[in-house]
Each structure stands twice: as C-alpha cells, then as structure tokens.
Amino acid sequence: ELREALGAAVGMLFRCKACAKLGFSSRGDVDRLEAALPGCTRGVASLEDVQPTVRAALGLKSSAMPGLRHACAALLAVEISKVEQTSDWEARPLTEAQLVYAATDASILLPLHRAALSRLASQSLSPDK
C-alpha cells in the first residue's frame, strides 16, 4: 500500500503542469524511478534536462556534456561531492551520506538552471545553440 501511495504521489507531481521538474542527464533516473514505481512517470509534464542548457552556457560543443560537479563549479562557484554516486543505492536504508548526496543533487538544479539561463541571456544565446 505504501509503495502504491508513493507511486500515486510521485505521478501527481510528474503530471502537474505548474510544477517545475528539472533533471541533469536524467533519462536513466526516470527509467529507474519508473521501474521502482510502475506508472508514476506516465504522462510526465515538462521534465527539463538542465545539462544541454549548461553545455550551451559554458560554450561547449554539442557533443560535450559536462557533469554536474563541473557545471556547479563553473556556473555557481560551488563544489559538490560526487563520492556517493557509485555507492549501493539498492541497499536499504540509504545512508545519511546518500540522502545528503541526493538532496544536494536535487536542490542545486534550480539555481544551476537559473545561472545557465542568465549566462546565456548575457551572451544573447539560446539554450539550443
């Protein structure tokens, strides 16, 4: 029951047109979320991958995709740790370090997106250049 309720809540957020949903190279994350909570990503509204916007803001070639750590350092002057990225995310409960890692990854995306858009605007560029 708890898993179904969680899936329904996540699904409502994903379908909400008024809620900004940002990711960073997030295709795999969405696939894993769908596998864990079947149906929760069906009908997702406005999920934006911030990575291409960051790439454009940093003036990188279209084939170059910066990592989140590099993007945060370059656009926000913030150093984030990626140590937990390769830890065991299947094990439960998640460790305190994993929770902090996940929260940091999620909470940094809005300021990162704003910084990338601001840099593009100051250079009179669009995110798809």
Predicted regions and their residues:
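Conserved DEDDh/DEDDy metal-dependent 3′-5′ exonuclease domain
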Residues: 1-115
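Acidic two-metal-ion nuclease catalytic site recognized across multiple nuclease folds
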Residues: 108-129
